[in-house]
Structures are given as structure tokens and as C-alpha cells.
């Protein structure tokens, strides 16, 4: 006795209908098509991008997730920022993001992209987090993150795309951008010479 188990049997409208007919809606079909063919724009400025470049090799093979790197933002629906972002680069990054068609997604990769990293403590030109410029969907911490972590971030983004509705795709997200050139912090001398510590000690004595 041969028993055939069809995993798609619950999606068929009637038991007597052909198994090639599957019920779905336009929203689910659109989400399935988009999550199966993400086209990323690689915005690498530092050492984190080297870890992402290792995904292209045969060991990790990111082609199985439908990722097709693009060199033009008009053909991409995902931008991966990897590395330090400076104030001079901020307008270019925003311009690339605005040229991407909707719906679009952002993965912030590495500590320098998320918080500014080690360059944020004593630098006047480093952006303290790329989310001050463009809205971020997935945060990927690490210095640098491993290729396995990058794959996990892509999987989480695919799950987010699968749960979206058609109204979410059309909703404008430009209001989430907080780009400003006025960082609220004080300029102090270099902390590596020891003079900064001496100045704090003198101020405490004067009080």
C-alpha cells in the first residue's frame, strides 16, 4: 500500500483539485518573492567589509539566500553599511539610501557603524551611529562580526519581510531620519597625554 503525503495539502482549496493549485494572496506572494531575492548594495568602509566578502566564497555561499550584490542603488532593496561613517560621508550615504526604491532595508554591521566604535571617543568627525542618518532594520554588533552572524542577520531580515503587509511596504519612513551636523558634546584636549586628567584635577580643586 503506497501512501503519498503532500505537505501542501492544507493550501489546496478542495481535496479533488489538482495539487498544482495553491491558494495564497498577493501580499504573501510579494513577500515570498522579495525575501527570496534580496539585492544588497554593499557600503563597506572598513575592516568589517572583509568579513562580508568571505560570504561570497564557496564555504558560506550566500547565493543560496538569493543575495545578488548590486553596484547601483536604483537596483538594490538592501544596503549593508560596514565600517566607520564620517560626517563628510553622511550626505553621500543618505543620497544612496534615498535613491533606493521602496521597500528598502538597512543592516548596520559592526560596532563602528552602530555606535561609532573606538573612533567615537576622541574624534570630531565620526557619526555616532548610522541610525542618526538612515533608519536601521537589523543591528549586527561585533568587531568585526563573523560570517555566521551575517547569515543570521540576513535570515532575521527575511523573517521580517515575510511578516510585512502591503500597507507597511507603502508607508513612508523618511520621518525616522535624524540627520544633524550638531552633535551635543564638548571638545577636550587629547586624553592620551595625561593633560586632560590634570585639568580635571585642577577644576575639582578650584571648586
UniProtKB/Swiss-Prot annotation:
<keyword id="KW-1278">Translocase</keyword>
<feature type="binding site">
    <location>
        <position position="48"/>
    </location>
    <ligand>
        <name>[4Fe-4S] cluster</name>
    </ligand>
</feature>
<dbReference type="GO" id="GO:0008137">
    <property type="term" value="F:NADH dehydrogenase (ubiquinone) activity"/>
</dbReference>
<keyword id="KW-0934">Plastid</keyword>
<dbReference type="GO" id="GO:0015990">
    <property type="term" value="P:electron transport coupled proton transport"/>
</dbReference>
<keyword id="KW-0472">Membrane</keyword>
<feature type="binding site">
    <location>
        <position position="47"/>
    </location>
    <ligand>
        <name>[4Fe-4S] cluster</name>
    </ligand>
</feature>
<dbReference type="GO" id="GO:0009060">
    <property type="term" value="P:aerobic respiration"/>
</dbReference>
<keyword id="KW-0150">Chloroplast</keyword>
<keyword id="KW-0793">Thylakoid</keyword>
<keyword id="KW-0004">4Fe-4S</keyword>
<keyword id="KW-0520">NAD</keyword>
<comment type="subunit">
    <text>NDH is composed of at least 16 different subunits, 5 of which are encoded in the nucleus.</text>
</comment>
<comment type="similarity">
    <text>Belongs to the complex I 20 kDa subunit family.</text>
</comment>
<keyword id="KW-0408">Iron</keyword>
<dbReference type="GO" id="GO:0051539">
    <property type="term" value="F:4 iron, 4 sulfur cluster binding"/>
</dbReference>
<keyword id="KW-0618">Plastoquinone</keyword>
<keyword id="KW-0874">Quinone</keyword>
<dbReference type="GO" id="GO:0009535">
    <property type="term" value="C:chloroplast thylakoid membrane"/>
</dbReference>
<dbReference type="GO" id="GO:0045271">
    <property type="term" value="C:respiratory chain complex I"/>
</dbReference>
<keyword id="KW-0479">Metal-binding</keyword>
<dbReference type="GO" id="GO:0005506">
    <property type="term" value="F:iron ion binding"/>
</dbReference>
<dbReference type="InterPro" id="IPR006138">
    <property type="entry name" value="NADH_UQ_OxRdtase_20Kd_su"/>
</dbReference>
<dbReference type="GO" id="GO:0019684">
    <property type="term" value="P:photosynthesis, light reaction"/>
</dbReference>
<feature type="binding site">
    <location>
        <position position="112"/>
    </location>
    <ligand>
        <name>[4Fe-4S] cluster</name>
    </ligand>
</feature>
<dbReference type="GO" id="GO:0048038">
    <property type="term" value="F:quinone binding"/>
</dbReference>
<feature type="binding site">
    <location>
        <position position="143"/>
    </location>
    <ligand>
        <name>[4Fe-4S] cluster</name>
    </ligand>
</feature>
<protein>
    <recommendedName>
        <fullName>NAD(P)H-quinone oxidoreductase subunit K, chloroplastic</fullName>
        <ecNumber>7.1.1.-</ecNumber>
    </recommendedName>
</protein>
<dbReference type="Pfam" id="PF01058">
    <property type="entry name" value="Oxidored_q6"/>
</dbReference>
<keyword id="KW-0813">Transport</keyword>
<keyword id="KW-0521">NADP</keyword>
<comment type="function">
    <text>NDH shuttles electrons from NAD(P)H:plastoquinone, via FMN and iron-sulfur (Fe-S) centers, to quinones in the photosynthetic chain and possibly in a chloroplast respiratory chain. The immediate electron acceptor for the enzyme in this species is believed to be plastoquinone. Couples the redox reaction to proton translocation, and thus conserves the redox energy in a proton gradient.</text>
</comment>
<dbReference type="InterPro" id="IPR006137">
    <property type="entry name" value="NADH_UbQ_OxRdtase-like_20kDa"/>
</dbReference>
<keyword id="KW-0411">Iron-sulfur</keyword>
Amino acid at each position: 500500500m503506497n501512501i503519498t503525503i503532500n505537505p501542501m495539502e492544507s493550501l489546496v482549496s478542495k481535496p479533488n483539485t489538482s495539487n498544482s493549485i495553491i491558494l495564497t494572496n498577493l501580499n504573501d506572494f510579494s513577500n515570498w518573492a522579495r525575501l527570496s531575492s534580496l539585492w544588497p548594495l554593499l557600503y563597506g568602509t572598513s575592516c568589517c567589509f572583509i568579513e562580508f566578502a568571505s560570504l561570497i566564497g564557496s564555504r558560506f555561499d550566500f547565493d543560496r539566500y538569493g543575495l545578488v550584490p548590486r553596484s547601483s542603488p536604483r537596483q538594490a532593496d538592501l544596503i549593508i553599511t560596514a565600517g566607520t561613517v564620517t560626517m563628510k560621508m553622511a550626505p553621500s550615504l543618505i543620497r544612496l539610501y534615498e535613491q533606493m526604491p521602496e521597500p528598502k532595508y538597512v543592516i548596520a554591521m559592526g560596532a563602528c557603524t552602530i555606535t561609532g566604535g573606538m573612533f567615537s571617543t576622541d574624534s570630531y568627525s565620526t557619526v555616532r551611529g548610522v541610525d542618526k542618518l538612515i533608519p536601521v532594520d537589523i543591528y549586527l554588533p561585533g568587531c568585526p562580526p563573523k560570517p555566521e552572524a551575517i547569515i543570521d542577520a540576513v535570515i532575521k531580515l527575511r523573517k521580517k519581510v515575510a511578516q510585512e503587509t502591503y500597507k507597511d511596504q507603502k508607508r513612508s519612513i523618511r520621518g525616522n531620519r535624524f540627520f544633524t551636523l550638531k552633535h551635543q558634546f564638548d571638545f577636550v584636549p587629547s586624553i592620551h597625554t595625561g593633560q586632560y586628567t590634570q585639568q580635571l584635577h585642577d577644576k575639582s580643586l578650584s571648586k
